Amino acid sequence: MENRMSKIIRGDPPGLTNVRKSIYHHYIRVDNPKSLIFLSGQLSRDAFGNIVGKGDMKEQTKQCIQNMQTVLEAAGGSLDDIVSIVVYTTDIRQFKEIVAAREEFFINKLPTSTIVEVNHLADPGLLIEFQATAAL
């Protein structure tokens, strides 16, 4: 049986600007993925379901990312394996706080990323939700 190794190429093509080089790439190509992991929306909740960082976008962002890390580790992966993120927030004006929190976790292996402002999330105290795909 052939042992396939995933090859992940991350890039930004010439001619397209990437004003946030610290948090995303324009494309990621995954050749021969061994496994794909699809994460459901991760919220700023602790293991008991309590909201973490109520009213604090940066703290809620950090908790969402820590929850993604927990899910990925349970599935055999890590944050470095994330190739795509969709972020839903109730307040896009707090974009700088979101970026600051993300930069603490995503340093070298940046995913593709989309951020969308929404009216509400599952609970009025939630400010942000992350959905992700990872490739091993």
Give the ranges of each region predicted by the language model.
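N-terminal presequence-like segments and the immediate start of the first folded domain
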Residues: 1-66, 70-83, 89-136
